[in-house]
Amino acid sequence: MSIGETIHREFIHLKLLLKKNFLVSIRSYFSTIIELLSPIVFVLIFYIIYSYGSAVDYSNVSYEQNLPNCIVSVENRCINLMFSPMNSTCTVEIMKILAKNNNMEIYNYPTDTGPLPNLENTIGFHGGIIAMDSLNSTEQFILAHPNVTLAVVDFENFPLNFTINGVKPNDSLIGFNDFYDLSFNVLLNLSTSGGFIEPVDYSIPVTTSIQKAIYDFYAINNQKQIPTINFDSTQFIEYSSVNVVSLFGGLFYYCAIMISFIFLLYKVAFEKEKNLKQGMVMMGLSRSMYWLSWVITSFTIDLIICLLLIAIGAICKLPFFLGTNFLVLLLNFFLFAISSSSMAFFMLTFIGKTKVAIGIGMAFFIVGSGLQLTFNSLGSLIFQIIYQTDSNGAAFVRVILFILPMFHFSKVLTDINDKVQSYPTSQFKISDLNDNLDGSQYGMDYLVPTTGQSLAYMFILVIVYLSLSAIIEYALSGGFSFKTVKHINVPHFDDQDVANATNRSLDPSNKSPFIIRGLSKTFNKFLRPSKSVHALKYLSLDIQEGTVLGLLGSNGAGKSTTIGILTGIHSPTSGDAIIYGHSVVKDIHSVRKITSVVPQDDILWLELTAMEHLHLFAELKGIPVRERDFQIAKVLEQVKLTKVANDQCSTFSGGMKRRLSVAIGCIGDPKIIFMDEPTTGLDPRSKRRIYTLVKEIKKDKVIILTSHDMHEIEILAQNLVILNDGIMVCNGNALQLKTKYGEGYSVQVIAKSLEVIPEIINFVTSSLPYCRFLKQSALQLNFGFPINTDPKIIVNFFKRLESITKDENNNLMRDWSISHSNMDDVFIKVSNKPKLQ
């Protein structure tokens, strides 16, 4: 196949799978609506909590007499007190005494601090008092830098008799509002940056310190009349819900996106559990296009969910969404969503059961929610601890958390929250992605990645997880095995028919369309070679065109492994099969073009119609458009499903689903058809239809049929192969096998109780020469004896059986019957035949 043909085939497969995913999503509208509406529901719940404000319960605090020292929280600086106006002589004199009483320095704005809005010279301040020119300047700084200043005092009025060293100063605040009062306002910081950090009300110590400074001033200046002191207290900025945003915001955004993670695990695991993926691969589907279709589908759903999440957040006017650049929001949510989906694809290379998928998905959801709550509650502090430079423990935690997309997602949320908590004054812009977050506090140095780096880490996880998924899937499908045909020495077979079939298949001049030569398969146990399973051992045979081969064997005999190798699901350990000139080892793609499968498990999606299934597989098999409708109509009529062609498979009975699977296997006029128990679950009438169909289509084909119904095998198969423990133990038609392995006559006896079974076995085997006990099924016992047994002995035996069963006091048997040996008897005997020497 040329490169152009390969690309075209891959594109067709991708288009088909995307169409299938779209139709299944539309028809499964209930689950699709739940998945897509999850962000709206979670954000609305959060909005209700947000609207009720912070749930922080402020506790009682004891204060010392002096002004308390500030503690560094969100920035590498903190300021005890800011005051204004600095051009008021009276104000400055009072604040000098306050600074002296509390051993603090006064810094003037802007000469000592640097200009607004950043006041760069204050970086590294741990305490002190800053003199501002006006209350307006002070408020600008507070809005830009919340949680940095404990309080602000703004003086409004001094009494007319206010003097400094006996001299009345030239101050516009003297007698400005009242002739006799000294008035000032105190602005308090009651906002907080973390859910576990409760704000402290410093109104009492701040006011007490100011009053003490005023009293000291009057005492120093020998003024006996102390004025009436009036003050108002106001919170800096009323972040009524800042704790709710910090504590729960990220949790709800996380949950809104992780719902799609659980849905993805379930949907893909469902297709694997129902063998839908494997069935399509056996019909020629490209494995890489299967996974690519799911990547495109899941990433598209992730994008829709992220856009809905951002839209509902903006509609609810949540500061997080209004104060953050749209591109930053989209990058954060979308990268988290697709990195989580990529991690899901990595897990799905090992997960094949829906219960396991849901369990793992819920475990990640719950554990991740706990981590998210912890990260958001501690804010930037937790990342400073994790990214500290001198801790081996922190380095170990970083390595573990790095592989989790939720860790980087939480980091970005925290960075954004630190900026937008004072929205609208402060917003998160594109330029903030590169802000330096390194620093040192609490005795530790830390190198925290920028917000942009955290986004890049999530993108790296997308690449890593998808690459690992592709590599593991390729390895599990045998992609890394060297495509060469290995041969082993021909073993010795006791059965002459098996030996002849083996020698015939190995003959280089054999021109049969279907030749199997020394096919073997060993499933090795990693690190436990002694536990390796030899599933197939040197299977060799040839099949002529127009033949139905019955492949028989008990469970674990090697039937499924044989079909898996011939359809490319497994790679053989040694040997090869040549199918119409194409090697299954070297050219499986060409083999699949002429091969079709009716698997034991129906390859059906309940959401699709019979017609949609047939169109899907017709295009998958490469049937030309001009022939497609005719082929579909033909197979629908053959399995009598024409009237329900446009009904969804969810409305079909088990028999109808099975007939549709047979129709799918027959479409496209394949040269080879593998039928794995095609009539399972069918009523007798439907079985006859399938029998007729098989007889009609076998003319120019090779059909390999497996079944546990020996009557069905006798009707359909011209040649039978029985496997036992991976070995071909007999090869021939039904008459040959019954002649060779049959017991002649078969006697069935139904015992009255389990206790009398040993007595019945002894009675029958002693009454008939060379009689053998074959099997027991509950109370039914089967015996076989040679066809050349003396008729007199047989007649006498039957008379004794008849007299026993007619005796009302008989406690041995209820009934008995006799028949010629059938394929069931042959199968039982052959299954116990000595194995390969």
Swiss-Prot record:
PROSITE patterns: ABC_TRANSPORTER_2. ATP binds at G553, S554, N555, G556, A557, G558, K559, S560. One of its GO terms (cellular component) is membrane. Gene3D superfamilies: P-loop containing nucleotide triphosphate hydrolases (3.40.50.300). It comes from Dictyostelium discoideum (Social amoeba). It is a multi-pass membrane protein. Keywords: ATP-binding, Membrane, Nucleotide-binding, Transmembrane, Transmembrane helix, Transport. The keyword Cell inner membrane does not apply. This is ABC transporter A family member 8. One of its GO terms (biological process) is lipid transport.
